[in-house]
Swiss-Prot record:
Record keywords, A-Z: Methyltransferase, S-adenosyl-L-methionine, Transferase, Ubiquinone biosynthesis
This enzyme's EC code(s): 2.1.1.222, 2.1.1.64
Similarity annotation: Belongs to the methyltransferase superfamily. UbiG/COQ3 family.
GO molecular function, one term: 3-demethylubiquinol 3-O-methyltransferase activity
Originating organism: Acinetobacter baumannii (strain AYE)
Gene Ontology BP term (one): methylation
Gene3D superfamilies per UniProt: Vaccinia Virus protein VP39
The protein's name in its UniProt record: Ubiquinone biosynthesis O-methyltransferase
Pathway given in the UniProt record: Cofactor biosynthesis; ubiquinone biosynthesis
Domain of life: Bacteria
Family annotation (Pfam families): Methyltransf_23
Catalytic reaction equation(s): a 3-demethylubiquinol + S-adenosyl-L-methionine = a ubiquinol + S-adenosyl-L-homocysteine + H(+); a 3-(all-trans-polyprenyl)benzene-1,2-diol + S-adenosyl-L-methionine = a 2-methoxy-6-(all-trans-polyprenyl)phenol + S-adenosyl-L-homocysteine + H(+)
InterPro entries: SAM-dependent_MTases_sf, UbiG_MeTrfase
Binding annotation for S-adenosyl-L-methionine: R38, G58, D79, M124
Amino acid sequence: MSQLNVDLQEIAKFEALAAKWWDQHSEFRPLHQINPLRLNWIDERAGGLAGKKVLDVGCGGGILAESMARRGADVLGIDMGEAPLAVGRLHAQQENVQNIEYRQIPVEELAQEQAGQYDVVTCMEMMEHVPDPASIVKACQTLVKPGGHVFFSTINRNPKSYLFAIIGAEYVLRMLPKGTHDYHKFIRPSEMAHDIRNAGLTLKEMTGLHYNPITKRYWLAPNVDVNYMVHTVKTGA
């Protein structure tokens, strides 16, 4: 592909942190903390993950991908950063998780190879790091089987999300390294819904992901002002 739908600076951020991906006290602590919540949410809405072929787009070091494999899914994790993928492969080997594979490939390229081959496609905490989110949504639609499930998560774009996701998370609480997020790449739910419809997916549910920094507790609620997750289905034959 002559022009990849990637931001090299975004990839470099996570490449530099790759060795810490499975350290639950590192910059990736928030991903470890939210993972049980998002895993159960995906598992329930997909009608169970066991025995299904699952693709995790923008998998990084494999926190979600490996947890889905542990639920019995046959998982492929893809990412454009080689260092996080190497970490994911090593961790799966150390934990003897055999039903998982990792590849460095753009999702648009994989869509040309494996159209309609996946029961479930996940793309979590990744949409706000690419130049063209709509292209990602379309590729995910291509990859999932008719009747299959596609899940996304991202961050809303408004003053509240800037305050919470950037000022609060990166500068005040220091949950994330400074510069992790670019406010202008955040995606409003209306924009997300537009891309979903244009791709030929049916929006089933949109829910907010919330965090209390005092109790360090995460929960789901209807408010989608900051972080939110989306469940879609590919209808038709």
